[in-house]
């Protein structure tokens, strides 16, 4: 892992007719390798009043966008970016390295901007990136996650490394399987159930446990979607 490349986020949503849950894990609909917004990996877009226009000039750079399948999302990097997304009712992707307070502040700003522009966002669903490390020993889970992200945090937030990395870990998902599910459910409630989740399990060092957790969680998603007639 270098400073620009810090996780593969799997979108493990269940397709109707998919009979084998593990296939959804092994053949995820999309794998998203999150890259620092200032690199050239993302397409950078300038949104004008009528359509999306890609711009090459640095001074025209307004927002990073991410495509998942056929859907377009705007990376929630600032209030300005969020305001632009709301103007066109585009959904957001919230970053894993923002603390929950910052994510919620940006969501509130998005909602206020949508109201300002008279945009109906009732059907808009955002994505929230989360690192997940499941371990009955919560301290082990936190240490593994810290080891996985510390190079990136040291490069991006060197002046407050210890405080930053602790806050980031607290705003991601670590602990027992039950505690992790409870945390995600609670977080969904804080976001008024307007977000889906991009989950990264790469910090888990036990590869067999990681695969087991992904399959179990995928089954949980399938059951939830079946119970709520979402498939």
From Swiss-Prot:
Q: Which GO terms describe its molecular function?
A: alkanal monooxygenase (FMN-linked) activity
Superkingdom assignment: Bacteria
Q: Does the keyword Flavoprotein apply?
A: yes
Give the keywords, sorted: Flavoprotein
Q: How is the cofactor bound?
A: Binds 2 FMN per subunit. Each FMN has a myristate attached. This flavin-fatty acid linkage is probably the result of an enzyme-catalyzed reaction, most likely the bioluminescence reaction itself.
The cofactor required is: FMN
Q: Which InterPro entries match?
A: Bacterial_luciferase_CS, Luciferase-like_sf, Luciferase_bac/NFP
Q: Does the keyword Chloroplast apply?
A: no
Cite the record's note on assembly.
Answer: Homodimer.
Q: Which family does it belong to?
A: Belongs to the bacterial luciferase oxidoreductase family.
The protein's name in its UniProt record: Non-fluorescent flavoprotein
Originating species: Photobacterium phosphoreum
């Amino acid at each position: 892992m270098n400073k620009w490349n810090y996780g593969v986020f799997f979108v493990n949503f269940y397709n109707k007719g998919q009979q084998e849950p593990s296939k959804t894990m092994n053949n995820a609909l999309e794998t998203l390798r999150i890259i620092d917004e200032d690199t050239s990996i993302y397409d950078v877009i300038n949104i004008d009043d009528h359509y999306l226009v890609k711009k090459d000039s640095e001074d025209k750079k307004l927002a990073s966008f991410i495509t998942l399948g056929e859907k377009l999302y705007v990376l929630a990097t600032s209030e300005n970016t969020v305001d632009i997304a709301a103007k066109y009712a585009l959904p957001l992707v919230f970053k894993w390295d923002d603390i929950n307070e910052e994510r919620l502040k940006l969501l509130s700003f998005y909602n206020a901007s949508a109201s300002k522009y008279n945009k109906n966002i009732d059907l808009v669903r955002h994505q929230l990136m989360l690192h997940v490390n499941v371990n009955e020993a919560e301290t082990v889970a936190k240490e593994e996650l810290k080891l996985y992200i510390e190079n990136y945090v040291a490069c991006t937030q060197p002046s407050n490394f210890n405080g930053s990395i602790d806050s980031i870990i607290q705003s991601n998902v670590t602990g027992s399987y039950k505690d992790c599910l409870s945390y995600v459910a609670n977080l969904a409630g804080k976001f008024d159930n307007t977000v889906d989740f991009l989950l990264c399990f790469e910090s888990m060092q036990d590869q067999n446990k990681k695969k087991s957790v992904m399959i179990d969680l995928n089954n949980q998603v399938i059951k939830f979607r079946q119970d709520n007639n979402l498939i």
